[in-house]
Amino acid sequence: MKLKVGVQLFSVMTELANDYLKTLENVAKAGYKYVEYVDVPGNSPEEIGNKVKELGLTAIASHVHFDPFTSTHEDMVKIVEDNVKMHSEAIILPMGIMTTMEEIKTVAAACNEMAALAKAHGMAFYYHNHCQEFYQVEGKTAYEWLVELTDPELVFFEVDTFWATRGGQKAVELIKKLGSRAKLIHQKDMGK
């Protein structure tokens, strides 16, 4: 399997906010072939998707604003439809705050629902961690519960090695433990 290295557009957030389409052009000029979207208001999903196609970029995924506690089914459908227009291969929930078992179950159910919608439209679904998911809740980390309570055929994990390490985890061990469910990885430097 060939490793695909791309840029998470969060790293050029200021530029995106000023001119999303021009920033995509600059990313392509820098030699990137793969991008991971981040929500920035301004351009329509069609404009972004058309620009990505024009530049020969592949949108491997999209971090979306989706609140597992308040988003409705209709909200989820719109997110999926917008990402189809953006030619995104996957949708990512970039963190859910879970401090109780009830909250974990709510996030897991929302992930399962969004993942089923994504799959029906030819996309994958991922959960992206930060450090909060590694707090203990009823004998396990919230992250372990989330892995256990989500459908292994539908919900995958994008391991952010920085945040996993900040949360007290050994990122390589976490990736190995997730196995085929860890298909995307975020890496960035961490100071001492």
Question: What residues fall within each predicted segment?
Answer:
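Active-site groove signature of glycoside hydrolases
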Residues: 86-103, 121-132
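N-terminal pre-domain/capping segments
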Residues: 1-89
